[in-house]
Amino acid sequence: MDCKLRAKNCGGCPMLATEYAAQLKKKEADVHALLGKYGPVAPIRGMETPYHYRNKVISTFAPAAGGKLTSGIYAARTHKVLPVESCLLQDEVLDKVMLAVRAAANACRYQPFHEDKGTGLLRHCLLRRGVATGQVMVVLVTAQPVLPGAKNFVKALLAEAEKRGVPVTTVVQNYNPRRTSVVLGEDEKVLYGKGFILDTLCGKTYALSPRSFYQVNPVQTAVLYGLAVDAAHLTGKEVVLDAYCGIGTIGLTASDKARQVVGVEVNRDAVRDAIGNAKHNGVKNARFFAADATAWIREAADAGQKADVVFMDPPREGSTPAFLESVARMAPKRVVYVSCNPETMARDLALLTQKGYRAEGFTPVDMFPHSAHCEVVGSLVRVK
C-alpha cells in the first residue's frame, strides 16, 4: 500500500515499501541468526491483514492556517509535526476519533502548545480503543491545569464523533507542565465517563487507564500469549512466577491452568491495575507485587522459594545477570522468555544455558508489521 506520509519523512513504517512476505522472511532470518545456535526457530507468525492494527494512538497538536490547530506525528528526527488524517497502522476508528477531537478543539478555539515559547494549551492527544469491546478513551494532554470550557469541549467532541459514526466512552484531561518529551503528566481529571475502558484478551477482561501498559496489536498479542502459555506445559499443579508482569496479562492468561500465579512489576500503577484485573475476572489464585524484578527474585531465591515455571517479559534492554542467576537458583522446570528484542534475548540465553537450561525452541511473532521490530517466544527446560 502507498502512504502519502512516507514521502514527507514520516519514518513510522521503514519497511512499508517492502512486500510483507519479504518483511517476514527477513525478520525470521534475523531471529535465526541471533538465536538459532541455541535451538530451532519456528516459522514466524505474521498477520493476515497487516494494517490498521494499532489500538493506541498518540497525536501532537500544532498550529494550522487561520489561527486553527491540527494534529499529527513528528517527522523523522525532527520536532516538525506532520498533520495526519489517516494512517495505515492506526485503528481506523481512532483515525476518525482524532479528527473529531481536532474539530472540537477548534470549535472551542483552543491553541496548541508551543515548545519553545512555552505558550498555548493543548500538547498531545492519546487515544485507546478496546478492539473487542469497541470502547474508546480520549486523553487530552494540556500544558495548563485548567481546560477552559471543558463541558463545552466534551459536548462538541461527542457531537463530532457521532457525525463520524464513532464512539467516545470516556474523556480524561492530563496535565503535563514539564518541558519534556514524555507525553503524560502526573495529574488527571475525568471529564466524561469513568476514566477507563475495558477490553478482552485471551478470555480475560482488562480495565485500561491512560497509563496502562497494554500491547498495541491485539491480534498478535493473542498469538504471543497463546504461544507463551502453551510453552509452559501447565497441568494445573504449578506455581508460576510472572516477572515484569505489567498489568498481569500473561499471568492472568495462565491462571486457569496453574495452581498459583505470582506477578512482579516495578510500576506501581501497573500493579494496581493487575490486582484490579484479577478481581474483575474472579481470579483468586494470582497475587501481584510492586517491586524491582531483580531485587524481588533475588530475595525469593535467598529465602529458598521455588517456582515450577517462570514467565519473563523484560523491557528492550533485557534482563539482568542477577535476575537470571536467581532464576537458576529457584530451579523452575521451565522458563518461558517473551522478548521484544532478540539481541538482548540472545545475551540472556548465553547465561541461562550456562546455568543448566536448554532452549527447546523459539517462535518469532510479527507484532509490528512494516517496522524492523519482532517479538519472540522462547521455551527453555531445566536439564541439570
Per-region residue spans from a language model:
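Rossmann-like S-adenosyl-L-methionine
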Residues: P148-K384
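Extracellular/lumenal ectodomain signal focusing on beta-strand-rich modules
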Residues: P43, K56, H124, T170, ...
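N-terminal, Lys/Arg- and Ser/Thr-rich interaction peptides
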Residues: M1-C10
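Extended interfacial segments that mediate partner engagement and assembly in macromolecular machines
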Residues: N9-E115, L127, V131-T133, V146-L147
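Short, aliphatic-rich beta-strand segments
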Residues: L127, G134-A143, T205-S209, V309
